[in-house]
């Protein structure tokens, strides 16, 4: 019976994929309930690698390759002893590590090291067809560099211990050797500071330090909309304004706004809608200006209408970010549960969707860093991690200082079912939920959420215990404690979701709920939809 259940779920899930892109948030230490800095990243893609590895420290003097496109089909399970850069990876350069590197968590976009430096990225697009983008297109076509986002984040995590060090490192590499790829917005945090870094193309980049009481958001469009001369809180490529004038990217009139000069015109709902939703959801001085004004999700002047960042009235928790990332525009005119694509049971994980939300079915993984600067490095380097759509996944604690990850982290491909893969384990729950999402999401929450709440408290207690052990000279024992605890939690979730996928599929067999009738989520609205479609057929 188990094989039959899994076969059905695999077919449903593979058929439900489509293309999208990432959402990131960053929160300063004075805006969080526990005094940590936070970053988050929903890695939304049809094709990204689902495996997660620990990359160990490399000794000083080790040669490091600079690889472009080194992800598809690559295997970093034995790196650096075995260098497998996959089917598309090309080594463009190499350098010698002048000092021992940091251990870090390697993913499609690597995200935290054992110093507690954390990252998240959002690939930024612009209006390629617009006339005003013509100078940018011409400039981009002539700009070739060797650093793509995958490699730059890997190298920054290997070499930097603080957010400022990471910004300096990334900026120097782009200045010296150039950027390879679409523009990117990268949030970087270390428990004390948060920086927002944007790479545009060629040798152009800039970054600013987020105020400690602020919340930053980005949904696939460049956002740094102001300019300062280099200072303690703002950094940029040398001669950035002069370059923009010389190339015709800027005419010298008005404010110099990097996001508009180098990546202008991305005003699609797919991006602006997600930004608007954050301002609606988290109360701040800006909320009254946007709440109830659904038309602002199509705003064509977002850099003027929306703030670059804001101070939330209530302190942010890991759960706050998880809820935002699970959002489907509920309660607005863009409510995904009321889309005809969602069917009678409000399946927001259907494809296609009418309005692109933050929560999407093709999310590869979802991570929230939660770095507390007052803890020792070994105990502070915490990230909450889960595979799949944020609304249906769990979050399990991972420490970049661990000696090993649970086995299901490093196996599997989305193209072939693997019962030992963490991604497939969650994907089956997600897919079963699409059979009756309105009911399934409540079942998932009832099982998951109490465990998550208890896990937050238990994890902080474990961190404090590890900190005491390190203070008493028991560093190795503390790392063993963190490893044992984190892997126990990961295995607990893996087993729980293995059972949950079968329970959900059995619950919705033959289109019912435990063999009882299942009413539509929005009964009257759904009747209108069906009637309208029926009328068209006539």
What is each PLM-predicted segment?
Residues 1-4:
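Positively charged n-region of N-terminal signal peptides that target proteins for export
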Residues 7-16:
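Bacterial N-terminal signal peptides
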Residues 159-167:
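Short, charged, surface-exposed loops that flank catalytic or proteolytic processing sites
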Residues 245-374, 378-382:
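Glycine-rich, aromatic-lined ligand/substrate-binding cores of catalytic
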Residues 339-471:
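Substrate-recognition/cap regions that form aromatic- and gly/pro-loop-enriched pockets
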Residues 448-538:
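Histidine-centered catalytic/metal-binding microenvironments
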């Amino acid at each position: 019976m188990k094989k039959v259940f899994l076969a059905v779920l695999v077919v449903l899930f593979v058929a439900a994929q489509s293309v999208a892109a990432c959402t990131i948030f960053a929160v300063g230490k004075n805006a969080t309930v526990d005094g940590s800095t936070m970053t988050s990243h929903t890695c939304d893609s049809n094709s990204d690698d689902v495996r997660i590895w620990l990359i160990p420290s490399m000794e000083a003097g080790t040669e490091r390759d600079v690889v472009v496109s080194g992800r598809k089909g690559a295997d970093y399970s034995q790196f650096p002893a075995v260098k497998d850069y996959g089917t598309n990876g090309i080594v463009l350069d190499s350098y010698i590590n002048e000092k021992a590197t940091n251990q870090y968590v390697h993913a499609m976009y690597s995200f935290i090291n054992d110093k507690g430096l954390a990252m998240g990225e959002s690939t930024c697009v612009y209006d390629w067809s617009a006339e005003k983008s013509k100078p940018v297109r011409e400039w981009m076509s002539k700009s070739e560099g060797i650093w793509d986002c995958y490699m730059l984040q890997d190298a920054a995590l290997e070499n930097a211990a603080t957010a400022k060090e990471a910004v300096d490192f990334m900026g120097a590499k782009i200045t010296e050797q150039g950027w390879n790829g679409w523009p990117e917005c990268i949030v970087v945090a270390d428990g004390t500071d948060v920086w927002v870094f944007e790479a545009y193309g060629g040798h152009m980049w800039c970054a600013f330090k987020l105020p400690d009481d602020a919340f930053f958001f980005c949904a696939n469009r460049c956002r740094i909309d102001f300019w300062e001369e280099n200072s303690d809180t703002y950094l940029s490529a040398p001669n950035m304004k002069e370059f923009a004038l010389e190339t015709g990217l800027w005419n010298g009139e008005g404010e110099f706004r990097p996001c508009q000069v180098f990546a202008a015109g991305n005003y699609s709902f797919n991006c602006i809608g997600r930004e608007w939703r954050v301002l609606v959801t988290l109360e701040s001085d800006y909320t009254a200006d946007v709440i109830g004004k659904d038309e602002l999700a199509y705003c064509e002047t977002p850099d003027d209408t929306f703030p670059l960042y804001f101070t939330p009235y209530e302190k942010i928790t890991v759960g706050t970010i998880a809820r935002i990332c699970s959002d489907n525009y509920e309660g607005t005119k863009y409510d995904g549960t009321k889309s005809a694509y969602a069917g009678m049971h409000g399946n927001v994980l259907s494809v296609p969707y009418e309005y692109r939300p933050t929560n999407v079915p093709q999310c590869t993984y979802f991570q929230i860093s939660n770095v507390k600067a007052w803890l020792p490095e070994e105990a502070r380097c915490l990230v909450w991690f889960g595979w799949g759509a944020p609304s249906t996944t769990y979050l399990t604690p991972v420490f970049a200082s661990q000696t090993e990850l649970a086995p299901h982290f490093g196996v599997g491909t989305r193209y072939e079912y693997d019962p030992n893969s963490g991604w497939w384990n969650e994907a089956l729950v997600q897919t079963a939920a699409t059979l009756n999402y309105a009911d399934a999401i409540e079942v998932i929450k009832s099982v998951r959420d109490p465990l998550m709440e208890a896990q937050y408290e238990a994890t902080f207690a474990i961190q404090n215990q590890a900190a005491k052990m390190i203070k008493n000279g028991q560093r190795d024992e503390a790392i063993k404690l963190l490893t044992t605890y984190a892997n126990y939690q990961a295995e607990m979730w893996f087993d729980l979701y293995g059972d949950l996928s079968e329970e959900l599929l059995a619950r919705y067999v033959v289109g019912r709920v435990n063999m009882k009738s299942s009413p539509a989520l929005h009964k009257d609205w759904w009747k209108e939809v069906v009637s309208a479609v029926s009328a068209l057929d006539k």
